[in-house]
């Protein structure tokens, strides 16, 4: 079928090392990416980085599939399972229904899903406490803003993205109770993750209303938000992967989700014969989320700003600060 043309040509591999590693009854990992492409400079690319790390350390090839739309998820998982790939990593919450169906058909194959819970014994569900990481970048945004107006551009309007927004708003209000958040969602369908042009339009509309710092949690759509900030001389906050390098000088920071670690840990555990199903929720304490400070944004973050963000981080980890999770009650309160 056309869907599978070149599927197994797409491998993360290191050439000569692959055959010996595979001959030793090693793991045969695979990845089904989310829509938007492997090199989306965000979520998918973070998973790819984790896979590359595993491949570099072990020499084991990783089969990959980049779907063009969500209807391909189920067949991708089924074909990988039929070919003996294990574990199979599903990138993104939108694969949950397809993965659950296929995982029931193949109870002896292990699956890992990132960003959603599928309660089956052969599924490892890795979620993140995005509200905690978003709180930190909210603190930084409030400290960096001169206008007191801060923007948020989300992708698809779903509870998960509301979780980002809610955590961000709490961080803003923690640092500056008088600050105003102006928020927009890109859309209500999966297309909202892959529309940089619309992201740029929304960001520009916010800038016209006085926003001088904007946070994008919108997949590939966010690339347009970051570009618009550069074009207008405003500050932007990236998401999932460290996006600071995209526009040094206007990237205030990035809220990092260690999706790379989720993929790497799944592959490594399978290879070590220690893989287990269940649910893992990774927050600041677990090293699953954080904010990025490096050579590309260090000139934008004063020592005083860093100290305040680090103090908030320590207080969240200790329990002194509790960041409300929007998904606990579908409300930001």
Segments predicted by a language model, with ranges:
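A residue-level marker of the well-folded mature domains of exported/periplasmic proteins
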Residues: 23-333
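Sec/Tat signal peptide C-region and signal peptidase I cleavage site
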Residues: 17-23
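Bacterial N-terminal signal peptides that target proteins for export
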Residues: 1-8
């Amino acid at each position: 079928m056309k869907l599978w043309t070149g599927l197994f040509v797409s491998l993360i591999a290191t050439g000569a090392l692959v055959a010996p590693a595979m001959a030793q009854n090693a793991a045969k990992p695979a990845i089904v990416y989310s829509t938007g492409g492997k090199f989306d400079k965000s979520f998918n690319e973070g998973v790819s980085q984790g896979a590359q790390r595993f491949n570099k350390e072990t020499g084991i090839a990783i089969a990959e599939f980049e779907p063009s739309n969500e209807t391909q998820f189920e067949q991708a998982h089924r074909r990988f399972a039929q070919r003996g790939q294990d574990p199979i990593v599903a990138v993104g919450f939108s694969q949950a229904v397809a993965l659950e169906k296929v995982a029931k058909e193949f109870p002896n194959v292990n699956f890992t899903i990132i960003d959603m819970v599928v309660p089956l014994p052969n599924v490892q569900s890795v979620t993140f406490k995005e509200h905690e990481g978003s709180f930190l970048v909210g603190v930084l945004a409030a400290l960096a803003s001169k206008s007191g107006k801060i923007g948020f551009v989300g992708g698809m309007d779903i509870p998960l993205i509301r979780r980002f927004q809610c955590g961000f708003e709490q961080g803003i209000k923690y640092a500056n109770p008088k600050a105003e958040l102006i928020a927009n969602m890109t859309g209500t369908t999966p297309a909202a993750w892959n529309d940089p042009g619309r992201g740029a339009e929304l960001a520009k509309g916010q800038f016209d209303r006085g926003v001088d710092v904007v946070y994008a949690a919108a997949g590939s759509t966010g690339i347009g938000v970051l570009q618009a900030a550069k074009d207008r001389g405003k500050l932007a906050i990236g998401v999932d992967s460290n996006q600071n390098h995209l526009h040094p000088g206007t990237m205030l920071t990035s809220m990092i989700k260690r999706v790379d670690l989720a993929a790497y840990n799944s592959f490594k555990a399978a290879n070590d014969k220690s893989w287990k199903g269940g649910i893992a929720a990774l927050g600041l304490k677990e090293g699953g989320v954080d904010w990025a400070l490096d050579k590309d944004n260090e000139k934008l973050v004063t020592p005083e700003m860093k100290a305040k963000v680090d103090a908030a981080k320590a207080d969240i980890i200790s329990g002194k600060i509790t960041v409300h999770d929007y998904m606990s009650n579908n409300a930001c309160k």
